Amino acid sequence: PLVVIECKAPDITEPMAEGIDQLMRYQNRRGAEEPEGVPELFYFNQIVMSTCFHDCRYSSITGGVSHFMEWKDAYPYKLRDINPNGKPSAQEIAVAGMLEPSHLLDIVQNFIAYKDEDSGICVKLVPRYMQYRGAYKIIERLRNATKGEKGGTLWHTQGTGKTLTMMFVIRKMYNSFDLNNYKVVLIVDRKDLQTQMFKTTKTVKYAINIAGSIDGLKDLIKNTASDVTVAMVHKFGESEKNKDKKDKKKSGSLEQRTSVSTFPVLNTSDRILVMIDEAHRSEYSELAANMWKSMPNSVKVAFTGTPITKTVDNFGGYIDT
């Protein structure tokens, strides 16, 4: 089975904890001396879920007790569509949002990721509801919005996994016949984020490039390949000489620039998606002109956990909040 659900009566003591504990027992993950489960049941598993109707939580087979989460939104359904007579339960929301057949198949194909931990363990990651909803809305805009309205700002609070949301968008594009010829440019402002983004997007079958210099970035933007480029924001304006000086002082976030070069028009295609991480930072507003000029017809989506008016002014209205 793709999904294993443990259902508990809501009136027993701690039904959610008992349901999760039983899921762990079925998988032989409780550390018992003798085998107590049937791990073969989970060989093809994508989601495990514990529910007692009023509370419902899910995780992957590698998740610990603390990793079980609520699916709090049934998007694209409205809550009133699920239960017209009142507020739907957590179980009803999760079933409509995750387990409706087309949603579940979409999640399995486009929203499951894997991460290698430093300990050597491979962790299976399942999406959170805001990641699924945000990626879904971005894809819908790419497909259906008029020119000039396809981009915008995605406001998800800190810690909600915006990097994974970007990866889910890319994977869904790759698996969509009408979107898999896009070029994707991912822009970050820290080296650790650039490395994280590169590792994360390697799970997608696009060719992945890191822009190592301003000239390298220009060449990657110019080419017509449907690929993914990961670039630091300073590549859109700072001279390499000044960047080298500051790298000796600081290897993390950017410092204030002293020299900004002007980019020419590099690619006029309208099949370019630019996704910008932490787009509320001042660097993006200062260098936005070069982004716009180098790819004048591209779709630009800003990801932020701290929205400010200037972000919306630069990148467009809210796609999801």
Listing of model-derived features with the role each one plays in the protein:
Residues Q91, S119, V185, N209, ...:
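Short, functionally important structural connectors and interaction interfaces within domains
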Residues K205-G212, M275-R281:
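Short, charged, low-hydrophobicity "junction" segments
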Residues P1-V188, D192-A207, T224-D227, H234, ...:
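ATP-dependent helicase/translocase motor core
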Residues G216-T229, L266:
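Conserved motor-coupling elements within RecA-like helicase/translocase cores
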Residues P39-E40, D178, L220, F263-L266, ...:
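A general structural signal for stabilizing positions within well-ordered secondary structure
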